């Protein structure tokens, strides 16, 4: 694995001769956001003769009609926009991205899910960072959440996502160990994608799969705290559960596929352990749920639990609190989310949410989880 330096210049300069860039927007039945996504891509500050926008439209509802009119308007303004329709949804998002790549030879490929909106200067800043690191396969931006204040659920999710980006992703990048491409808000170097074997749809986490395969091929990545890309969080528990269940299944699939090659690779021990921990993180939900249930039993009349076991439960609980606060408080302050009281209220909902996910996932009937783009 290449040891990329994390010391990317704060404002790296772009070369005089800019490369061609392809912007891919995969969409499936998202009529409320497809036009906004196209307009955001069109507003990116990049020479028009070097920018191609692909709408990878697998929809079977009115999304396609809205897209046809939006694409027509953008073409009338002089932009190159390719509205890609497939005969079937084979490979789902990964299949759509691969099909789009086959239609354009641009050396750099930005990917945005339809409900994510980049600022107009995002492409110039992200490309500058990527070009400054010749062995970087991709650049990933932090994601800001436009509906983070919608309700208690989005506030709890934002707290966890802030910890993921501002602590986990940033630390992994600075430590030169593999970190995630989050499926949106980033740019791929085509040469790295092709060397790693391209997009694969044999897991539900095609982005994580590709990241690890590029690292195994000797590439690295760049993480940017700024500029952030604005996205949306699930506002309903059912939507959140489906999203998290899909991610959990995808992580397990990637672990089965790649942990062997990772541990047989020449990566550092730190990188191997960090990646293994990341792939196994989804297992924390049932562990925390069981631990909290046992703790509750021990509080109510000791529940017949041995004194030593009760003591161990409290030590475990204290350790979990330290991890939760350590991961979330720093990110909360770094991103100026508010005061301590507001933080405590939001943080208190996280264990409840984890228990809900563990119980909800255990209750699933084993049917394949519906595919989505985020």
Regions found by a protein language model. Name each.
Residues 13, 281-371:
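Membrane-embedded multi-pass helical conduit in multi-pass membrane proteins
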Residues 59, 113-117, 202:
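The conserved acidic donor/metal-binding loop of glycosyltransferases
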Residues 19-22, 52, 194, 209:
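Cell-envelope/extracellular polymer assembly enzymes that use nucleotide-activated donors
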Residues 47, 57-67, 88-90:
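A conserved acidic beta->alpha catalytic loop
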Residues 71-108, 120-204, 215-216, 237-276, ...:
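Long helical/loop segments within the catalytic core of UDP-sugar-dependent glycosyltransferases
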Residues 202, 211-230:
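Catalytic donor-sugar/metal-binding loop of nucleotide-sugar-dependent glycosyltransferases
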Residues 1-39:
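N-proximal low-complexity "stem/linker" segments adjacent to membrane-targeting elements
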Residues 39-50:
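Short, acidic, metal-binding catalytic loop of nucleotide-sugar glycosyltransferases
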């Amino acid at each position: 694995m290449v040891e990329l330096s994390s010391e990317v210049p704060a404002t790296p300069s772009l070369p005089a001769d800019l490369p061609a860039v392809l912007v891919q927007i995969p969409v499936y039945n998202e009529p409320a956001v497809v036009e906004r996504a196209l307009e955001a891509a069109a507003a990116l500050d990049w020479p028009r003769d070097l920018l191609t926008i692909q709408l990878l439209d697998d929809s079977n509802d009115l999304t396609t009609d809205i897209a046809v009119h939006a694409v027509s308007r953008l073409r009338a303004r002089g932009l190159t926009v390719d509205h890609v329709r497939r005969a079937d949804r084979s490979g789902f998002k990964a299949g759509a991205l691969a099909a789009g790549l086959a239609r354009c030879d641009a050396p750099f490929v930005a990917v945005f899910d339809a409900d994510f909106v980049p600022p107009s200067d995002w492409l110039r800043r992200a490309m500058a960072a990527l070009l400054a690191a010749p062995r970087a396969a991709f650049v990933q931006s932090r994601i800001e959440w436009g509906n983070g204040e919608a309700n208690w659920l989005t506030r709890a999710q934002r707290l966890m996502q802030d910890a993921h980006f501002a602590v986990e992703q940033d630390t992994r990048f600075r430590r030169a160990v593999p970190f995630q491409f989050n499926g949106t808000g980033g740019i791929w170097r085509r040469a790295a994608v092709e060397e790693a074997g391209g997009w694969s749809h044999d897991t539900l986490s095609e982005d994580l799969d590709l990241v690890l395969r590029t690292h195994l091929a000797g590439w690295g990545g760049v993480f940017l705290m700024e500029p952030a890309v604005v996205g949306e969080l699930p506002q309903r528990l059912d939507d959140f559960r489906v999203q998290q269940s899909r991610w959990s299944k995808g992580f397990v699939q990637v672990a089965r596929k790649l942990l062997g090659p990772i541990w047989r690779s020449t990566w550092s021990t730190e990188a191997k352990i960090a990646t293994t921990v990341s792939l196994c993180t989804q297992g924390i939900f049932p562990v925390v749920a069981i631990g909290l249930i046992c703790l509750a039993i021990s509080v109510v009349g000791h529940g017949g639990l041995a004194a030593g076991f009760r003591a161990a439960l409290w030590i475990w609980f204290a350790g979990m609190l330290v991890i939760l606060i350590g991961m979330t408080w720093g990110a909360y302050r770094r991103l100026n989310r508010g005061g301590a009281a507001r933080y405590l209220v939001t943080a208190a909902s996280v264990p409840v949410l984890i228990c809900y996910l563990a119980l909800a996932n255990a209750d699933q009937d084993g049917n394949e989880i519906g595919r989505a783009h985020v």
